[in-house]
């Protein structure tokens, strides 16, 4: 069994973390620029089989996405399960979690994972029924974060949130109509941040299970932000407070 990843950053990140997972790599014939050559040499030094391919082949393998001239066939990484969450929390003194409710675009999922990794988030939790898949597109956008941040899919998000609360984790959800802002919220300690889908926001039951609702203050004429942008803003306010 294998999966495909593509893009310079995604391949580079996996090579640094788990070179043993590579099975073969396809490089665009004739592309030997200064960004790709060091990566090719690093792959060869690990004994990875490299094959040259034409653009049509790479486009087909990546479903027409931007692959930057490199695609890798790799062994699947660790798949985190719902029952891994209690042990993960037990191992942490100050858990810092991100919950994504209804983020169905793989680009947004990948961008949120990238921000989560940069912010030091310990795990990202998503519902099984309303979430984008961690496919090659999401992994490319994540720029390696998909290999470092556990992504945990849960059957019942409200039940998982209750479990987190039983573990003394404070759950902060984002909502445009919240009566106080991100910058008025205390985001230290044992924390889970909940981000809803663009437009729709969090589902009713998810909202009801939050301990606190906050908004991002908006100064311009737009009424909302892309979910990955909003996630980055909230995560790094938490980082500021926690540092």
UniProtKB/Swiss-Prot annotation:
GO molecular function terms noted in the UniProt entry: RNA binding; rRNA (guanosine-2'-O-)-methyltransferase activity
What is the stated purpose of this protein?
Answer: Specifically methylates the ribose of guanosine 2251 in 23S rRNA.
| Reaction(s) the record says it catalyses | guanosine(2251) in 23S rRNA + S-adenosyl-L-methionine = 2'-O-methylguanosine(2251) in 23S rRNA + S-adenosyl-L-homocysteine + H(+)
- Keywords in UniProt for this one? Cytoplasm, Methyltransferase, rRNA processing, S-adenosyl-L-methionine, Transferase
Do you know which SUPFAM superfamilies this protein is assigned to? alpha/beta knot, L30e-like
Top-level EC class, please?
Answer: transferase
Q: What is its main location?
A: cytoplasm
Protein name, per record: 23S rRNA (guanosine-2'-O-)-methyltransferase RlmB
User: So what EC number does this one have?
Assistant: 2.1.1.185
InterPro entries, alphabetized: 23S_rRNA_MeTrfase_RlmB, Alpha/beta_knot_MTases, Ribosomal_eL30-like_sf, rRNA_MeTrfase_TrmH, SpoU_MeTrfase, SpoU_subst-bd, tRNA_m1G_MTases_N
Gene Ontology CC: cytosol
Protein family membership = Belongs to the class IV-like SAM-binding methyltransferase superfamily. RNA methyltransferase TrmH family. RlmB subfamily.
Gene Ontology biological process terms in this record? rRNA processing
Give the originating organism: Escherichia coli (strain K12)
Q: What compartments host this protein?
A: Cytoplasm
Q: How does it assemble?
A: Homodimer.
Sequence positions that bind S-adenosyl-L-methionine: 196, 216, 225
Q: Which Pfam families match?
A: SpoU_methylase (PF00588), SpoU_sub_bind (PF08032)
């Amino acid at each position: 069994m294998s999966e495909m990843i593509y893009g310079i950053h995604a391949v580079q990140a996996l090579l640094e973390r788990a070179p043993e997972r590579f099975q073969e790599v396809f490089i665009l014939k004739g592309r030997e620029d200064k960004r790709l050559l060091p990566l090719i040499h690093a792959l060869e030094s690990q004994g990875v089989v490299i094959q040259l391919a034409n653009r049509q082949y790479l486009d087909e393998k990546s479903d027409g996405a931007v692959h930057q001239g490199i695609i890798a066939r790799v062994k699947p990484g660790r798949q985190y399960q719902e029952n891994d969450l209690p042990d993960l929390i037990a191992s942490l003194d100050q858990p810092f979690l991100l919950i994504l409710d209804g983020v169905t675009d793989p680009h947004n999922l990948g961008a949120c994972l990238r921000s989560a990794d940069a912010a030091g988030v310990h795990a990202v939790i998503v519902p099984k029924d309303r979430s984008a898949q961690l496919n090659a597109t999401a992994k490319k956008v994540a720029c390696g974060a998909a290999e470092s941040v556990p992504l945990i899919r849960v059957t019942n998000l409200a039940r998982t949130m209750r479990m987190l609360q039983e573990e003394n984790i404070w759950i902060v959800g984002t909502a445009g109509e919240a009566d106080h802002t991100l910058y008025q919220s205390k985001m230290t300690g044992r924390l889970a941040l909940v981000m809803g889908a663009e437009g729709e926001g969090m589902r009713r039951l998810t909202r009801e299970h939050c301990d606190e609702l906050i908004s991002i203050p908006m100064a311009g004429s737009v009424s909302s932000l892309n979910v990955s942008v909003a996630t980055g803003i909230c995560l790094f306010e938490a980082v500021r407070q926690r540092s």
